[in-house]
Amino acid sequence: MANVFDYPKEQLAELIAKTSAELLAAETAKDAVPVIKKALEKYTIFDLQRIGGNIRREVEVLPEPYRSRYRPYSQDLLTQYHAFLADVRSGKAATGAILDRELWDEFWGRAEESSFSEEVSKNAPEAGLGNPAGKFFYRLVYGYAMLIAGLPGHPVGMPFPGGWKVLEENGEILCPIRDKEKDLPQALCNYCPAIQDERCL
């Protein structure tokens, strides 16, 4: 089984296009979950090690004390990946309606363009930067987490420079950077169910 990170550009583009088309055709979460699972299972243990290594390197270059505060949240991408597969295997994965059809269609309609785009979000983990395979992995994991499970792209408690963090108040997830990347259409923040924490503007 070849590593997705080693796919030739044409093969990776074909995977992204085929997966995205199937997800655009999905009518419910029950339809979408097997498609996401199939695509994620193409990533080998070596791909996952590369993603994890990139995340660890990203953390180590951060200045203290922010580095120590951020480190416990830095593996959220892989945590969400493992949680998704565990939910699928146990039959607990979401099966209902897709939460926002318009957002879903936009998200997967942009998948190939965003994966191969050289523009990057300053808030994306290193795993999603520079390599289309990493960007697509990131999109698959958070496509389920945000647009089906309704989870925020950054976990509650995650700190940001300046002392701000993602908070949960009165049943709402408040994020200090939710609306700060609207000029980057491929930024996953634009699809997050969290709302902008107005105190951070």
Where do the protein language model's features map onto the residues?
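Cysteine-centered metal-binding/redox modules
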Residues: 14-201
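Extended, solvent-exposed polar beta/coil surface segments
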Residues: 1-8
